[in-house]
Amino acid sequence: MKSLAISLSLLLVTLAVTIMAARAQFAPPVIIERFKSHEIPAIPARDRAGHPVRLADLRGRVVIVNLWASWCPPCRMEMPSLERLAAQYPNDLTVLAISNDADGWPAIDRFWGQKFPHLRVALAAEPDLIGQLGALGLPYSLIVDRDGHEIGRIPQGIEWDKGEIKALIARSVASR
């Protein structure tokens, strides 16, 4: 009887922690505004052909660097809203979706398919890319202005084509 009570207590604690963690993943976005002088560091990633992806090549466009993985439910949930946002600004916004999948391109392809034609996918070239950028988990996104300066970070999955974040992207795209 005593072991049953202990087991039930552990089950309830585990359930409570799981529910709190799930809620935290979909909390309102935390945007950390940065000074314009904060230039984003090089991000080690490679495209499907194995070529390095360079943020410097995207200067002149607003860039969302989205760190994700195919096994991450919040990552998978936010991809359609990133696609819709990128489709709204095809000439001014690049969404660079950098996968942290250990299984590489086969894992990406199983999820990606042809679902996200407006997003540019890449694979992290180093296993600790998340840690290098100060992220504690996935998804994790950096917002970069047209001059290559970081203007915000989103440390969780969100709906990108709604609310405050959509307004920030619209303002960034409008500034030339």
Question: What is each residue range found by the language model?
Answer:
Residues 25-55:
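N-terminal "domain-start" segment that seeds a small globular fold
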Residues 63-65, 96-98, 142:
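Conserved hydrophobic packing residues within short motifs/helices of P-loop NTPase cores
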Residues 9-16:
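Bacterial N-terminal signal peptides
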Residues 40-41, 63, 138-140:
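Short loop/turn microsegments at loop-to-beta-strand junctions
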